Amino acid sequence: MVVVVDTVSDKPIRPRHPEKAARPDALSPKKPDWIRVRAPTSRGYADTRAIVKENGLHTVCEEAGCPNIGECWDRKHATFMIMGDTCTRACAFCNVKTGMPAALDGAEPANVAEATAKLGLAHLVITSVDRDDLADGGAAHIAATIRAVRERCPSTTIEVLTPDFLRKDGALEIVVAAKPDVFNHNLETVPARYLEVRPGARYFHSIRLLQRAKEIDPTLFTKSGIMLGLGEQRSEVLQVMDDLRSADVDFLTIGQYLQPTLKHHAVMSYIPPEEFSSYESLAYAKGFLMVSSSPMTRSSHHAGADFAKLQAARAALPR
């Protein structure tokens, strides 16, 4: 018999996803050859990680287990996840910790601004956990972070990827009033899969959130994304595109769902690259100004370069 003694900490380790612990393992098919990423070992990666840690910040790159972290951090592109590392929702696809979050860190907006300056980011993406425990869903904290970055890095463009602010009246208005350049809220999947994949959310509430953001500020770029491989049908994906266009959404991202752990939703299918290309063509035909559709596409992947293309596409529209 072998006895393993933990000499590092005497504190019990809390499960990352306690609500999923009793679930049976969900087995996914083997990853195909086109799902490949390189290990994060570069100097740029190490430098980015050091800046994130010295400012006491969290990133969705780490917390959600993004497969593109090696590529992005090598270029010193990081997406900050504010309001803590613990989410009040328990989506079946997400690797972010779940539970009761800690109190907000009042120094976080300034720390995000400082890290943005140190990384030299021309385009910053800020996302967050859901904070259903807060009266405004964290909207004022998001707005404060936007303002802090504007003051510290006035030339940096800002993209926010927000929660849905369900039952948080006035929260959206607070965020939009802070004047981000891009307002992003991901639908994640088709409406028929919400009960199983995103049970705490409401599909048409999310559609309306995106529509309302553009109504409040017509100069705002709006953006949303979905994952494929969760059991959706092609016709349902096309309907999501139509729903987003009816809400005047400018930018659509489509990527392959990858299972974080065996306790998360299984991958039902791996979508081949040519089908992603087909969806991209159809989305452009439906009127999106910008579309990014590939197996490895994620909301903030190449966000800066894509924002420049988005600006150019709007500028080219007939007056």
UniProtKB/Swiss-Prot annotation:
Localization of this protein: Cytoplasm
GO cellular component, one term: cytoplasm
EC primary class: transferase
Free-text remark on how the cofactor is bound: Binds 2 [4Fe-4S] clusters per subunit. One cluster is coordinated with 3 cysteines and an exchangeable S-adenosyl-L-methionine.
Family annotation (CDD domains): Radical_SAM
Superkingdom classification of source: Bacteria
Database matches in SUPFAM superfamilies: Radical SAM enzymes
Any GO molecular function: metal ion binding
Binding site for [4Fe-4S] cluster 1: C61, C66, C72, S300
Residue ranges with Basic and acidic residues bias: 8-29
Region of interest called Disordered, as start-end residue ranges on this chain: 1-29
Cofactor(s) the protein requires to work: [4Fe-4S] cluster
Reactions the enzyme catalyzes: [[Fe-S] cluster scaffold protein carrying a second [4Fe-4S](2+) cluster] + N(6)-octanoyl-L-lysyl-[protein] + 2 oxidized [2Fe-2S]-[ferredoxin] + 2 S-adenosyl-L-methionine + 4 H(+) = [[Fe-S] cluster scaffold protein] + N(6)-[(R)-dihydrolipoyl]-L-lysyl-[protein] + 4 Fe(3+) + 2 hydrogen sulfide + 2 5'-deoxyadenosine + 2 L-methionine + 2 reduced [2Fe-2S]-[ferredoxin]
Family, per entry: Belongs to the radical SAM superfamily. Lipoyl synthase family.
NCBIfam families with a match to the protein in the record: lipA, PRK05481.1, PRK12928.1
Name of protein: Lipoyl synthase
Organism expressing this protein natively: Rhodopseudomonas palustris (strain BisA53)
Lineage of producing organism: Bacteria, Pseudomonadati, Pseudomonadota, Alphaproteobacteria, Hyphomicrobiales
